[in-house]
C-alpha cells in the first residue's frame, strides 16, 4: 500500500503488515494496560498492627468492661495498625515481544484507516523558536489536536522549539510507546521514521 506525503504529490510505499493489518482491540487493550501497570512505582506502604509503635499491654481487664480488648495497636483503634496493610510490590506484567509488535502494528493500521496518520518528508526547524514550530504545525491543519510527531532523528532545535506547546509531543522511533500512540489525535511520521518503524516491526 502507499501513503500520501503531505505537501507533495509523491506517495510512499509501505508494508501492509505495519499499516494495513486488522485492528485487534483486545490485544491493544492488553498491551496498553500492561505498559501502564509496568510504569507504576508500586511503593505504597502501610503499617500493620505488628509494625505500629505502641505498647502491646492489655488495655483493660478481661471481665466487666464491655467488649474484650487487648493491645491498642489493633486495627479497630485510632492510631492502630491497618488490617491487610499494603506492601511495596511490582505491578509489572510480562509482554511477549511478538505481541507487543503486533499491537503497535495494529495501532498504526487503525490510525491510517481513520485518517489520523500523516507522513511528511522531514520535520525540522532551523531555529529554536516556538513560533516557527507552531507555524510549521499550522501548515499540517491539525491545530487544536493532540499531536504526536515521530522523527528518525530529533535535533536540539526541534526539541527546544516544541517543548513549550502543551498538546504536542515530539519523539524518536526508539521512544515510541502504545500509550502515546493511542492517546494522540493525529500522528505525524517523517519518511525516515516510517522506514525505521518498518525495520523494527517487519
Curated annotation (Swiss-Prot):
Region feature (Disordered): 42-70
Subunit structure, interactors included: Part of the 50S ribosomal subunit.
GO cellular component, one term: ribonucleoprotein complex
Function: One of the primary rRNA binding proteins, this protein initially binds near the 5'-end of the 23S rRNA. It is important during the early stages of 50S assembly. It makes multiple contacts with different domains of the 23S rRNA in the assembled 50S subunit and ribosome.
Gene from which this protein is expressed: rplD
Keyword Cytoplasm: no
Listed NCBIfam families: rplD_bact
Superkingdom of this protein's organism: Bacteria
InterPro entries to which the protein is assigned, alphabetical: Ribosomal_uL4, Ribosomal_uL4-like, Ribosomal_uL4_dom_sf
Family from the record: Belongs to the universal ribosomal protein uL4 family.
Name of the protein this chain belongs to: Large ribosomal subunit protein uL4
Alphabetically ordered keywords of this record: Ribonucleoprotein, Ribosomal protein, RNA-binding, rRNA-binding
Gene Ontology biological process terms from the UniProt entry: translation
A GO MF label: rRNA binding
Polar residues: bias regions: 42-52
Amino acid at each position: 500500500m502507499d501513503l500520501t506525503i503531505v505537501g507533495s504529490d509523491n506517495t510512499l510505499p509501505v508494508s501492509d503488515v505495519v499499516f494495513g493489518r486488522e485492528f485487534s482491540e483486545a490485544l491493544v487493550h492488553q498491551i496498553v494496560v500492561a505498559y501502564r501497570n509496568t510504569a507504576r512505582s508500586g511503593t505504597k506502604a502501610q503499617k500493620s498492627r505488628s509494625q505500629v509503635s505502641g505498647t502491646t499491654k492489655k488495655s483493660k481487664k478481661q471481665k466487666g468492661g464491655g467488649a474484650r480488648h487487648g493491645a491498642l495497636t489493633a486495627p479497630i483503634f485510632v492510631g492502630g495498625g491497618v488490617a491487610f496493610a499494603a506492601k511495596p510490590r511490582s505491578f509489572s506484567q510480562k509482554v511477549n515481544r511478538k505481541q507487543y509488535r503486533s499491537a503497535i502494528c495494529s495501532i498504526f493500521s487503525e490510525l491510517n484507516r481513520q485518517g489520523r496518520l500523516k507522513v511528511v518528508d522531514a520535520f525540522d526547524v532551523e531555529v529554536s523558536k516556538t513560533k516557527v514550530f507552531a507555524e510549521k504545525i499550522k501548515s499540517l491543519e491539525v491545530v487544536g489536536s493532540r499531536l504526536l510527531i515521530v522523527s528518525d532523528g530529533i535535533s536540539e532545535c526541534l526539541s527546544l522549539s516544541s517543548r513549550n506547546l502543551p498538546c504536542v509531543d515530539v519523539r524518536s522511533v526508539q521512544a515510541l510507546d502504545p500509550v502515546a500512540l493511542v492517546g494522540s489525535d493525529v500522528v505525524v511520521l517523517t519518511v525516515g521514521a516510517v522506514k525505521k518503524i518498518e525495520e523494527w516491526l517487519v
